[in-house]
């Protein structure tokens, strides 16, 4: 467990430097720090786990970093605290979330699937597009989604 903790600390320390633009660069840096068994898939999982996002640093380079303004959303965070707004037009529903929470919530929505009227989702950092199934009305799907976010998990 101690080795995992030191890996996590080294990983977070590297991301705070805001100079790594690819997962392979992070892998190389961790290997140079003595974590020789690290690979790209492990780094990818860690990026998701810690809520890392790619943004432009002060040099205008796209780099990975940890969002500072909010805690990392987890599956134990109440959904109502992560969802900021729900809006729609005649064919799509748009959900605005706290930074870093969109992919977590989109994954939850995707798991509901076609039976609940969700054909699919596309998530960025803080925005989700939801496409309803052919036979589901926008109003019905909004009611389902709103109920999910209002429930206490």
Swiss-Prot record:
The keyword Cytoplasm applies. Keywords: Amino-acid biosynthesis, Arginine biosynthesis, Cytoplasm, DNA-binding, Repressor, Transcription, Transcription regulation. One of its GO terms (cellular component) is cytoplasm. Gene3D superfamilies: 3.30.1360.40, Winged helix-like DNA-binding domain superfamily/Winged helix DNA-binding domain. One of its GO terms (molecular function) is arginine binding. Pathway: Amino-acid biosynthesis; L-arginine biosynthesis [regulation]. PANTHER family: ARGININE REPRESSOR (PTHR34471:SF1). Regulates arginine biosynthesis genes. This is Arginine repressor.
